[in-house]
Amino acid sequence: MADHTTKEQKSFSFLAHSPSFDHSSLSYPLFDWEEDLLALQENSGSQAFPFTTTSLPLPDLEPLSEDVLNSYSSASWNETEQNRGDGASSEKKRENGTVKETTKKRKINERHREHSVRIISDITTYTTSSAPTTLSKETVSRYFYMPITQAAIALNVGLTLLKRRCRELGIRRWPHRKLMSLNTLISNVKELQKMEGEENAEKLQDALEMLEKEKRTIEDLPDLEFKDKTKRLRQACFKANHKRKKKRSLKSDQSQVPSCSSSGSVPSDESVDEAGMESDEEMKYLLCGFSSEFTSGL
């Protein structure tokens, strides 16, 4: 036990021989630094370097008058008001532009509407006032031998108006084709009358008078249909004319090409003559019926 204590004393014996250390310097080190700083400042203030300063002479400044201040303030106020006015004017211009565009569109629409109303009013007035007075049945019947388009031009009316007026007058179909067909039939009978001579002159004359009478009745009553005998006579005349034309063309071909008669492609003169005779006989029979009807009517 005693040995152990002696060893501990020996181990800490170096502390007794260590130099003395002043602990007062560690107690408040900040205060010492402040004192050093103050001393340095005093020394630097006492040993200040002289600086050379140069001063320029400044002009005497006069205070601004109220007029100048008012002018500056009014100018700035005017600028702000002008900017506001420019913005307002641009907005007004835009509004005016849109208003002008809308007014233009309205004017254009009104013009179109007025034009269409004027056209409709003209048509209605023309149809209601002028059509019944001028387009009578007698006036319209003068143009039956024209196609309906040419008749409308000659009457200086529209095609639709003319058709409407015809329906009002009881004319369902324009009788141009019917009357022209009768004229063709009358001309065919006249040609046959020249060819026959005095043999069947009386019968042909009776047929012509019957056809002229039927034409006048159709002029008065345009919706009247042809009689059966007139239809058959028209068909017979058409066949006879067709066969005559065929015979003429056959003769012209045979005169140009003599060898053509031997071929079977071209009909012979006898067959054409037989067909022509049949059609002529049919025409004569129908003409006899016309003459008998004419005499019985008398």
UniProtKB/Swiss-Prot annotation:
InterPro entries (alphabetical): RKD-like, RWP-RK_dom
Q: Just give the chief location class.
A: nucleus
Show where the RWP-RK domain sits. 121-203
Q: Where is this protein found?
A: Nucleus
The answer to keyword tRNA processing applying to this record is no
What does UniProt give as GO cellular component? nucleus
User: Compositional bias (Basic and acidic residues) at which positions?
Assistant: 1-10, 81-102
Q: Name the UniProt key words of this record, in alphabetical order.
A: Coiled coil, DNA-binding, Nucleus, Transcription, Transcription regulation
A single Gene Ontology MF term assigned here is: DNA-binding transcription factor activity
Q: Which residues form a coiled coil?
A: 188-222
Pfam entry (one): RWP-RK
What ranges does the record give for the region Disordered, renumbered to this chain? 1-22, 73-112, 241-279
A single GO BP term for this record reads: regulation of DNA-templated transcription
Q: Where is the composition biased (Acidic residues)?
A: 270-279
Signal sequence residues: none
Provide ranges: composition bias, Low complexity. 252-269
Q: List the disulfide bonds.
A: none
The keyword Transcription is assigned to this record? yes
- Which PANTHER family does the record associate with it? PROTEIN RKD2 (PTHR46373:SF7), PROTEIN RKD4 (PTHR46373)
Q: What does this protein do?
A: Putative transcription factor.
Protein name, as recorded:
Protein RKD2
